[in-house]
Amino acid sequence: MPDASPSCAGQAAEDHALEHLRGQGLRLLARNWRCKGGELDLVMLDADTVVFVEVRYRLHAGFGGALGSIDGRKQKRLTLAANLFLQSEPRWADKPCRFDVVALQGQGHAGQPLQWLKNAFEC
């Protein structure tokens, strides 16, 4: 069987991350929210905190792996998208916010450990 396309692998990684986060009590507010500045993979609510979750998948650990792929430029794009989300959804604008990263590495996700880095960066 041929390897899954990168978009299929990324979708599977997001599905796995969403399932894990829901199991930890987070509630989904939006998925793949798009704007001119970029995309937010998952927007979730953890108690009263709005959580912007970037899901990163890498097949191999080269070049820093999944976690290493969140550079300063990516952080700025996520921050911009989060601000636009809050402007478009004012009911969440007065809530505390944080940026989390869920990283998955390797082939296949079922049963694979994931890394959930809460408060991965400050904005």
UniProtKB/Swiss-Prot annotation:
Family annotation (InterPro entries): Restrct_endonuc-II-like (IPR011335), tRNA_endonuc-like_dom_sf (IPR011856), UPF0102_YraN-like (IPR003509)
Gene Ontology molecular function terms on file: nucleic acid binding
SUPFAM superfamilies: Restriction endonuclease-like
Domain of life: Bacteria
CDD domains on file: PoNe_Nuclease
Coiled-coil stretches: none
HAMAP family recorded: UPF0102 (MF_00048)
Stated family: Belongs to the UPF0102 family.
Entry protein name: UPF0102 protein PSEEN4497
Species whose genome carries this gene: Pseudomonas entomophila (strain L48)
